[in-house]
Amino acid sequence: MSDLLAGAYLAKGTIGNVGTPGAPIATFSLVVVPSQHSVTGTVIITQAVQGPDSHIVVPVTGKIYAAGLGKFTQLVSLKGQYVHSVPPPAIGSFLAEFNAHFAIDNAWNGVGGFSYYQHNVENVPVAAAKNLQTELA
């Protein structure tokens, strides 16, 4: 039972074209437990364009597995749900799905994509947070 969280660590970073005006960016903060192939945490999707999708917080769970894809050593998948509010003149809210997938190296840099209500972002960079890069080195 004590080995359940063996090797657990924190991973932080972004998925998306950071610096591109109007591009949606998914910022992640995840607890990774490689021995259990599990990932749990939070993703915050931001977009400079104002509207109901300009700031979304999503609790996520997922899987992490070793990969043998050249420079990419790990495959990660995330899923979660968040409350999406319908803009006026309609009234209401519903649970919307969030999904992400990426192929990364040991420093959490690579390529991936994510989708959320009526948005699909593919083939974008995955970058570890600057302070995480030095911790993993």
Q: Could you tell me what each predicted segment is?
A:
Residues 18-22, 47-54, 85-89:
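Short, cysteine-centered beta-strand-loop-beta hairpins and adjacent loop/turn segments enriched
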Residues 61-101:
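Mid-chain, well-packed structural core segment of small domains
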Residues 32-57:
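N-terminal glycine/threonine-rich, aromatic-flanked beta-hairpin/loop signature
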Residues 31-38, 65-72, 104-106:
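A short, structured loop/turn motif at beta-sheet edges
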Residues 2-36, 54:
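Short, solvent-exposed loop/hinge segments that bridge or flank secondary-structure elements
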Residues 53-65, 109-137:
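Edge beta-strand at a domain terminus
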Residues 43-49, 79-85, 115-121:
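Short, solvent-exposed aromatic-acidic interface loops
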Residues 22-26, 53-61, 92-96:
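Amphipathic hydrophobic-ligand
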